[in-house]
Structure formats: structure tokens, C-alpha cells
Amino acid sequence: MTGGGTRLSRRRLLADVVGASAAGLAGCSASESEPNGTTTAVETDEARTLAERYAPVLYFDANERWFPTDPRPYESERDGDPVVSGFDALDGYSERRAETRVPEPTVFYNVRSYAGSPLTVVQYWLYSAFDQFTTNFHWHDWEVIHVFVDTERDEARLHVASSHSRRVPNNEHLDPEETVPRVLSELGSHSSALSLNEERESFQRVSIDGVPADITNRAIGGLASLADVPAAYGLPRDEGFRLPFVVPELDGAPVYEHDRLPAVTREDLVPERLTIRSFDDLSSPPTDLPARETGVVLDFEGREDPEGEEAYALVPAEEVEHVDAFTGPQLSFEFAVPGFAEDAIDGHLTATDPPWTQARYEDPAADITDPTHRAALAERYDAVGAPGSVGSLVASVTEAVTTDDAPAGEGLTTRESSVEAVALLESDPTAVPTFGGALVLRDVPPGEHRLTVNRAGTAPFSQRVRVEDAGSDSGGDSGETATEDAKPEDTQTADTTTTDAQTENTTADGTAESPPGVTVAGADGEIPLVAEGDAVKLRVDAEGTDATLTDVAVEDDFAGRLYDAPVRGSDAVYVHRGGAYTTEVRDDDGAVGAFRVNPAAESAVTIDRPRTGKASLASFLADVSRETAATVREATEGEDGGGSTDGGGTDDGTESDGTGGGTGPAANAVGGLTRSLEAVAASADRAAERAESGDAPGADRALEAITDALGRAKERLEDASDELPGPAANAARARLDQASRRGEQALAAEKL
């Protein structure tokens, strides 16, 4: 249809989110969508009228250094063509800013009308001389705000405020009540958030206490933990989160020391209290970074009742289109990628292109990142193509810390961090920040990627993920993605596959099934980072193994699965030294191996030539049983019970007649538990020996007996639980459950 439709309510929009089509849930790409109609430039007078009517009010952070300005004073020539040099712009702007708070505030507008449609779009382009952020920083920064207008109904249909790169979902609002968009600019990066309710100086992601949200982006699909979080970048520093800024360097030195920037001083960058020199300078994430505060407010100079104390000029974008290029040596940022031996430092470059060279300059609908918004406009206007479907990558980035529920140094939990992280795909040079701990990468091409996540003060995380062609199995109607192929049911690795369901479902354990087109990264969608001071590198050295390893997973006794990824040969992951871990490996035949890891004070732990099959799993049973017996003894030292055992055990997995060192019921209960555990360990040793010698029937007999013995050990644990400190009892339960699962795997294993 070409006319306007009915206004969508917030409730209706949320209903559409829950019941959205596969394409909507997939995280659609404008480049993969149906083509939009062509646009033409609106005539000068009409364009000016529309631009003045919808001109945004711009709210800046109190620490902002680079306000929207006119780049033309910094023009020069290169080979006869007009260019703007990064050195000239930054140095010249800094010099002018020493004399006036906001040098030549300017906003450029570009108004496009879709052919044969009442849909017209007013674009507001904001140029800043520099961009300083937590990762990406560059000379010249162009940001855009779109107002989609129905000229027949004379009302705004959609506000779109750009957020970082095309990988990040924009802040968008369908059918806004407010005609004039109020925009909150992110410090340093100038990413734009919307503020359309009565709380003018803050961003509100969801409706609270009757105050409507500032965006109508649909919820994040694929993770139950993020099911209520709208997929929009927002404004993290205004939402209770922190972003440490990094000082940009050129030729190994801070930019303010460069001889071509004589007017630039340290004070011309984001203040020191908000910055760090590098992410690995800290032993833990920073907790003392100040929150966002409103500073300069800019309003259109022609508005009768302006909100701000400063005013900007509104200039047609065509007046600056003659500039051939915005130049400057590429700045880089350091990004740590975990390696088996040493971590690599990837220097990734960022750049900015002039607006008039970008597809969205003439086709603004290409910048709609929310599929439900695009679908709504496509239903109302023939000029907008229906959304398509390509891969999206999602995860929740948390932090791993010790838990009081476990013995000291033997267990973790994960929790939300107040410090945002940044992610990088090996295939893309632009890093993407999280928002509220949510990692959302849009328009990820099909194929295998390496995802790396950094956070200030934490060790880096990296894993391989595979994104399928979103429409490969469904004629292009919906997508399907997975981190790796489905695994055998007898393993404990969590896999990500998609189904034909049209809405997101939740499994019995609370894990959301991935909607079509969504790849869930991490372990069950969670990426727990470890503070640098607590990090231990866990290496899996596959060199010399007799099988090809395909997957590695790491599970803490209390926090559960923390790492789960496909691998190519050797692998490395950082773990918290306060955890107690089971490391699982899988080979290309589907055989599983398991190993206990207790890093404690180690700087690195290596699993050499990991094996898969019965022998590996039986050896694991021996290790975890002895470890649990030691935990029980240590917890009861100095108390009645828990005395020594003869370390024996019979071939059927029962304990010998050793009596231990204590007397009374408590001694019997605790002593019986430790004897049961050590008997299991001794029998597991025999099972491993038989498997290694090729005696499969003998190994299975020992494993069957161990299964029964583990059941008795669990009974004795409950008998002794009143005499054990809570953390020790908790650890014993978790490890016995782990041993039972691995025992079943060992029995089912065909490989010795």
C-alpha cells in the first residue's frame, strides 16, 4: 500500500515481536531485503521547510570535546581535488575551541523522497573533527539521524538514530509521538540515542512506571536471559554501565604529541578520569568511572523556543558534497586475541566515508536495522522492500567470580558486569561494543568466524563460530544458524541449532532455542570473562594426539559450562584460578575425553595430547573421586571422622574394610564417604588400565560396578552432610553428579 496505516501501539509492537516471522526474528539485513524504491532529492524550498520542522535537539555529554561543526574551514587540495585532512581538522578545531566553547556548530541536511510514494526522509548529518572511544577511533566522524515522514498525513513515521557500525542495531522509534527527535550523543563516539519521553536528558530502554520507552526496537532473539532486552545500542553510560576510553596513538605515541598537531593538548581529548592507556593495564575491570552527565545542548538556531543554550546552523548537505575525501593516516587500536603460546595483539584500523558515498544517503531505508520496523513500513509503503534474513550473532557477556557456595578456590559463579565489553570478528576490522552486557552483531556473513571479546581489566576471550546461510534450507524465507553441527546425545556439550518454529521457545532448563537466522555464541549464550589478575591460561595441546579434535568445553563445578567451541587442533582459553574444572574434548569420530583442572596458583595449565574414549573417561573418574575425597578430608580435619583409608577397593567397586581414624556416627558417615570415593578411584584406575590394554569387556565390568558405587557414595554423602561444611558438601554433590555423567559416557564409548 502507498498510504499510511494505523499507528502501532507499544503493546501491539511487543505482540508482533513475540509472534514475529522467522525473517523478523533473524535480525534482518537491508542488503538482503527486497529492494527499496528509488529516491530523488526534494526541491530546495520544501526540503528546507521539512528540515527546519524536524531539526533535532542535540544533548551532549559534559565531557564532550568534538561538537558537530562545518569541515569546510579545514579544506585543502590534493592533486587538484578538495579534501579535508585529519591533521588540519583536529588541529584547527582544537585551536578554535580554545577561543569558543562550540566552534561553528553546524548540522547538514539531506531530504529524499521515494518515487511514487508519500514517504520522504529527512536526514541530519553531523560532522565531528575526531572520534575517541573505547576501541574504534578515527579522524572525521559522520553520524546521521533519519526522520521518515508521511507527507500525505503530515507526520513522522519513524526515527532512526545511527549507532556505531552497521553491525550494531540502531536506536529506532516507530510512530513517534514527538515530531522533533531529541538526540543524546554518546561521549567521544557520537553514537546517537533517542530521548522522546518527558525524561529529556536520559535514555529509557523500556517502559517504566508509565513512562514510555525511547525506542520500539524488538527484543533480542535467541537467549532467554536477553528476551526482555530491546535490540538497540542505547546509551550504556546513561544506563548504569561503564565504558573506559582509550587514548588514541599514532606512530606509537599519543596523538597530542604529534608534531603536526601543535594546537592539540591532552586536555583536548576525553578527560583522564575516563580513560585508560590500554585494556591490559588493569588487573580487574575499573569500578570508579564517572557516569554520564549532560553538558552542552544544541538546538536549531531558527526555532522560536529552543531547548538549548547553544544553537546550530542548518546547512544543505549538497554544499559540502564537493569535498572529494576526508583523509588522515589510519589510527589503530590494540585488540588481544588469545593464542596457544602467547596472546596476539591485533591492530585493527577504522575509517569513515563521506555521507554522499554511502548507500543510505540516497536510500535511507537501508539504514533501518530493526526488522519489525522495516516490515511495518513495507506494509504501508510499496517503496520499502520487505525485510530479508541473514545471520546474527548474540551472547550475554558476564564475568566469572568465586562463590561462597564452594570451598575456597574450588568454585565460581557468573554475574553481570557494570563495565561494557567490545567484540571483534576476524572477518571485520571494526570492533563492536556491548550494551548492558548484550552482544549483538548484525548481518554476519555465512561461514566460519573467529569471535574475540575484550574488556578493560580482563583476559581476552576467543572462540570459533559458524554462521550458516540464513536462507539455505528454507528457500530464503527464514534462516538457520549454528555454532557447530549437532553433537551426539551422550555428550554434555551444549550446541546451538535452530528449528522451524516461528517464535522463540524455551527449553526445560531455561535456555532459549535460537530462532532462525540467529547464532548463539559462548556457552549456552554466555561469555564469562575473567579479571586479568585472576586469569590462568588453560591450554589444550592437540599435537601428537591420535585423533582430530573438533570441540573443547570447560565446565566449573558450580558455575557450569563456561566455554564451548569448535576447534582446529590446539586451543587456549582463560579460566579463573578460583575454579575447579572439567575440560571436555571431542574428536571427529564423536568420541569424548575428560580431564580435571585445578589451576590455583598456576600461571598456565596445559593438557598434553588429550585422549578420547573409555580410558580417558575412566582416568577422569579416578581423578575427580580422589579430588572429592581430599576435599571432604580437608573440610573435616581436626573433627571426629574423616580419618585415613587403606586406599583399596575391590573389583566390584566396593570399599575395603578400613575403618578410618574416628569413632561414632559422624566418623562413620564421613569416613564411609571418603572410603567410598577412594574405592571408586581405585576401580576407575583398573578400568582405565583395562581399556588401555584393549580389554573392553573388563573395562566395562569395572565401569558398571563404579556406577553402582557412585550411587552408594551419593547416599553416604547425604548421611554425612550434617557433619560437612556446606561448601564441601556442595562440591561433593556437584562432582558426584559429574562423575555419574562421565561414567555413563565411558560405558557408552566404543573407542577404548
Regions inferred by a protein language model and the residue ranges of each:
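A short, amphipathic beta-strand motif
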Residues: 391-401, 532-545, 550-552
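Long, charged/polar, soluble alpha-helical segments
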Residues: 618-752
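Structured interaction patches on ligand/partner-binding surfaces of diverse proteins
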Residues: 456-485, 490, 500-523, 588-614
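A short, solvent-exposed beta-strand micro-motif common in secreted/extracellular proteins
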Residues: 447-457, 578-589
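N-terminal secretory signal peptides and thylakoid transit peptides that target proteins
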Residues: 2-20
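Short N-terminal edge-element motif at the start of the domain
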Residues: 70-144, 148-158, 422-424
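Domain-length functional cores that host ligand/cofactor binding and catalytic or interaction surfaces
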Residues: 135-146, 152-392, 415-418
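Short, acidic Ser/Thr/Gly-rich low-complexity loop/linker segments typical of extracellular
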Residues: 405-418, 424-445, 557-571
